[in-house]
């Protein structure tokens, strides 16, 4: 407990920032999923408190994810009854716990670094592009939408141009003022003032935006922002009304195969998104701590079971909230737990105050977070590393921008695999010749993709040559390649080619070639 109290100041400050970022995202994702608004809040609270406590990650923040929006909306429509969907969420959570015990968390280790960094940069760009309309008061799409094709039938870019046609002057002024304040709060001047450092920039932005709009409203100005441009939390008039927001799964739907299919789909997609987000969180962590991924799957599974049992949306670890948490200076998991606790207290006791916060102020916070994720220096870093790193990095960004997170990641992995295979293809077989003396050396892993080049080089060996086939440095040689070499060995004497074979003591390559015994006639 002492290690958490040691950084209490930083964690409390960061938790406020995460709360301000998470609230509209929870509501927006619930709206975009076609679920009750309060289901997003439930998921946010459970993600903060339950998963925050059980997770081995010190900085990851869980909550309802934009990447599950389409899956959730489809499942709710297909199942028709929300209680049946909640049962699917519980089943999905149970399957995640099982995946954790089966040690499926290792999957995340196979995603290349260029793809993970590309995902982070893409999310940063998405935040900037998607929040721009909210910054200037065009709030037609729900908060947290990350897909290229939006729920209002526009795409990321057309929405920006459309937003310019319908600028809300007050939102524009507050939004620009908020960004300038965020930049100022990052300056050396603020960092040298201990008293000001205690207040996170995001909190100051929200306070200034709220005060400006409240002043306009109380003075009767027509420039005051309407409620559609503000946070909109469900408000309960009594304790009974508050508890009526909770919904419970109906076990009679266990017989419905669609419930099970929805649960399996949620488990697979939520687990993949979580593992990717955890990889990203570990790379963003200044202390480079490593999260136990199997424990994370178990924590996510328990969180999803709890969320589904009380009416909440499915959960994953979320990069946007995590990056906001790290950017705000969080040091431990107390920040995550505190943000969930404060969210619960806020919706219980002060929802009417939170409903005065302008969305344009929160958009400024998210845009600034996006900028930190997609800095120009990151692009330069991968460009310097070479094309085999830069192209998968850029491909991941472009694919995520024009599709969604999971499809973009898969595209990035495929591009990275192409460069890996290409590199291995080039280095696996080396051919050197001096007059009629040939050296054919196999290195690393020689796959079936190397068969054409091996076949071609062996066929090109002229009569009366001397050939050394060296497999001492090979870890693996595909059977198709072995067959080609054996075929060459079998017929080499017909062209009066002398062959020496070296296989070394490696068990995987020793005695793999059939050296014929040729007798002189």
What are the residue ranges of the model-derived segments?
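The feature marks cytosolic C-terminal regulatory regions of anion transporters and related permeases
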Residues: 372-521
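Hydrophobic residues within alpha-helical transmembrane segments
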Residues: 16, 46, 65, 90-94, ...
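Core transmembrane helix bundle of multi-pass membrane transport proteins
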Residues: 1-15, 80-288, 352-353, 360-400, ...
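Alpha-helical transmembrane segments of multipass membrane proteins
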Residues: 26-28, 48-56, 71, 75, ...
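Helix-loop-helix junctions within the multi-pass membrane cores of secondary transporters/permeases
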Residues: 63, 86-111, 120, 290-361, ...
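Membrane-helix interface "capping/anchor" motifs
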Residues: 53-63, 188-194, 327-333, 377-384
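Membrane-embedded helical hairpins/re-entrant loop segments and their flanking transmembrane helices
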Residues: 4-13, 21, 25-58, 253-334
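Membrane-embedded helix boundary and interhelical linker motif in transport proteins
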Residues: 54, 67-89
């Amino acid at each position: 407990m002492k290690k958490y109290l040691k950084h209490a100041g930083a964690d409390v400050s960061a938790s406020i920032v995460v709360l301000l970022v998470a609230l509209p995202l929870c509501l927006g994702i619930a709206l975009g999923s076609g679920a009750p608004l309060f289901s997003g809040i439930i998921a946010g609270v459970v993600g903060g408190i339950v998963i925050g406590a059980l997770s081995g990650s010190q900085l990851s923040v869980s909550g309802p994810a934009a990447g599950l929006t389409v899956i959730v909306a489809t499942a709710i429509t297909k199942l028709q009854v929300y209680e049946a969907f909640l049962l699917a969420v519980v089943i999905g959570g149970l399957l995640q716990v099982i995946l954790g015990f089966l040690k499926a968390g290792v999957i995340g280790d196979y995603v290349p670094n260029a793809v993970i960094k590309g995902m982070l940069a893409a999310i940063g760009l998405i935040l900037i592009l998607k929040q721009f309309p909210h910054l200037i008061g065009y709030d037609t799409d729900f908060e947290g939408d990350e897909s290229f094709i939006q729920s209002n039938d526009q795409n990321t870019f057309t929405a920006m141009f459309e937003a310019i046609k319908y600028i809300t002057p007050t939102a524009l002024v507050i939004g620009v003022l908020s960004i300038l304040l965020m930049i100022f709060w990052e300056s050396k001047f603020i960092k040298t003032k201990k008293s000001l450092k205690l207040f996170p920039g995001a909190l100051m932005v929200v306070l200034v935006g709220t005060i400006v709009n409240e002043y306009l409203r109380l003075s009767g100005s027509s420039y005051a922002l309407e409620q559609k441009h503000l946070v909109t939390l469900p408000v309960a008039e009594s304790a009974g009304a508050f508890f009526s927001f909770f919904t419970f799964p109906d076990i009679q739907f266990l017989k419905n195969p669609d419930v099970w299919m929805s649960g399996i789909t949620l488990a697979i997609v939520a687990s993949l998104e979580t593992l990717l987000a955890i990889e990203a969180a570990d790379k963003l962590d200044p202390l480079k701590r490593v999260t136990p991924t199997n424990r994370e799957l178990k924590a996510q599974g328990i969180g999803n079971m709890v969320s589904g049992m009380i009416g909440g949306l499915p959960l994953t670890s979320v990069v946007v909230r995590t990056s906001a948490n790290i950017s705000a200076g969080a040091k431990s998991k107390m920040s995550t737990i505190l943000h969930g606790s404060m969210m619960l207290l806020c919706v219980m006791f002060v929802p009417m105050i939170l409903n005065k916060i302008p969305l344009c102020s929160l958009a400024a916070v998210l845009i600034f977070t996006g900028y930190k994720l997609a800095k120009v220096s990151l692009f330069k870093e991968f460009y310097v590393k070479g094309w085999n790193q830069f192209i998968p990095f850029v491909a991941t960004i472009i694919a995520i921008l024009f599709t969604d997170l999971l499809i973009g990641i898969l595209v990035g992995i495929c591009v990275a695999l192409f460069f890996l295979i290409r590199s291995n293809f080039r280095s696996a077989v080396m051919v050197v010749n001096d007059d009629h003396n040939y050296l054919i050396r196999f290195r690393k892993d020689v796959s079936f993709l190397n068969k054409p080049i091996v076949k071609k080089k062996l066929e090109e060996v002229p009569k009366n040559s001397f050939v050394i086939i060296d497999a001492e440095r090979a870890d693996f040689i595909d059977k198709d390649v072995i067959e080609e070499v054996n075929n060459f060995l079998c017929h080499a004497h017909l062209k009066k080619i002398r062959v020496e074979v070296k296989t070394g003591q490696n068990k995987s390559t020793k005695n793999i070639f059939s050296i014929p015994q040729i007798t002189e006639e």
